[in-house]
Structure formats: C-alpha cells, structure tokens
Amino acid sequence: MTYRNQKLLEAVREAPCMACGVEDGTVCAAHSNQMRDGKGRSLKASDYRIAALCFKCHSELDQGRKMSREERLNMWEEAHRATVGWLFDNEVISLKR
C-alpha cells in the first residue's frame, strides 16, 4: 500500500535543497524513482520515500544527462537521508511515547 501524507509534502517545502543547499522557494518533495520504493509505471513512491530538492536538482535527477544512473541514485539516497534528518531536527516527525 502506498503511503500518502500532504502535511509531510508541504513541510518539505520549508527545507533547503538537500543536494545543493539552495533556499530559493522551489524546493519540493522528490519521490524515489526506484521500484523497490513503490514506484511504478503510473505510481509515485510512498511519501516517506522523498528528498527535499530544488527545481534545478530535481530536474537534473529526473531528466538530466550530467549524471550516470548510479550517480543519480547516490544523489537521491544522500538527499533522502538528509531530508529525514531535517524532518526530525525540525520536529516535523517525532516519536510517539
């Protein structure tokens, strides 16, 4: 089942780009492009598999030609980990006790 959370996607818009650090108002949730994360022909991955990326980095990730497939995967994974850290550090995500 695919997880959806609009509040999470909106919160990511407040983060800096986790690839280049820019805070230019274009940052949004870039979903994983990997099948293992639920990506399908007409399906986005779950909302918990996102990375905060600016328009430029998101475009390069999805349609760019500057990086190899492996480099794109590594870029997204690093940005995803940084995004999860940012979400916890900024108390967007917290643990229930």
Language model region names:
Residues 51:
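Active-site cofactor/substrate anionic-group-binding motifs, chiefly glycine-
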Residues 1-10, 38-45:
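Short, intrinsically disordered, charge-biased short linear motifs at domain edges
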Residues 21, 55-58:
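Cys/His-coordinated zinc-binding microdomains
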Residues 3-30:
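Short cysteine-rich loop/turn motifs with clustered Cys
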Residues 25-41:
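Short recognition patches in nucleic-acid-associated and regulatory proteins
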